[in-house]
Curated annotation (Swiss-Prot):
<dbReference type="InterPro" id="IPR012259">
    <property type="entry name" value="DHFR"/>
</dbReference>
<dbReference type="GO" id="GO:0005829">
    <property type="term" value="C:cytosol"/>
</dbReference>
<dbReference type="GO" id="GO:0046654">
    <property type="term" value="P:tetrahydrofolate biosynthetic process"/>
</dbReference>
<dbReference type="GO" id="GO:0046677">
    <property type="term" value="P:response to antibiotic"/>
</dbReference>
<dbReference type="InterPro" id="IPR017925">
    <property type="entry name" value="DHFR_CS"/>
</dbReference>
<keyword id="KW-0046">Antibiotic resistance</keyword>
<dbReference type="InterPro" id="IPR001796">
    <property type="entry name" value="DHFR_dom"/>
</dbReference>
<dbReference type="GO" id="GO:0046452">
    <property type="term" value="P:dihydrofolate metabolic process"/>
</dbReference>
<keyword id="KW-0560">Oxidoreductase</keyword>
<dbReference type="GO" id="GO:0031427">
    <property type="term" value="P:response to methotrexate"/>
</dbReference>
<dbReference type="GO" id="GO:0004146">
    <property type="term" value="F:dihydrofolate reductase activity"/>
</dbReference>
<dbReference type="InterPro" id="IPR024072">
    <property type="entry name" value="DHFR-like_dom_sf"/>
</dbReference>
<keyword id="KW-0521">NADP</keyword>
<keyword id="KW-0554">One-carbon metabolism</keyword>
<feature type="domain" description="DHFR">
    <location>
        <begin position="2"/>
        <end position="156"/>
    </location>
</feature>
<keyword id="KW-0487">Methotrexate resistance</keyword>
<dbReference type="GO" id="GO:0050661">
    <property type="term" value="F:NADP binding"/>
</dbReference>
Amino acid sequence: MKVSLMAAKAKNGVIGCGPHIPWSAKGEQLLFKALTYNQWLLVGRKTFESMGALPNRKYAVVTRSAWTADNDNVIVFPSIEEAMYGLAELTDHVIVSGGGEIYRETLPMASTLHISTIDIEPEGDVFFPNIPNTFEVVFEQHFSSNINYCYQIWQKG
């Protein structure tokens, strides 16, 4: 199963401040919506609760709590390992979509990274992990918006 990570991060690596994204770059979330349409997303519970279930997507939510979802498009798993095992039976591609701990644990499994770097350095308490030098940028596009950003695709070498 192919594992991709998709994230928007600030220049200082911040991806969140509590349950919130500390910016709103017009147009950037359209990339997320387009690339995740009809895909399986792997997220942590806090990320899922903050973003909610977008239509036409299926979710594998990882949580250590007794949390359950009242949604046919959501499957809850107690660990990333169990989620990956279960997803391998359901799909050939999963997009990891946060939060910070989930990104850190799945980065070694990923072959592709979809990263939007937002031209801002906000305060925050959740960070995207450093990208290992085993990845290289294979595509890059800059966008002018209310807050400029750069979308990159990284491939593992």
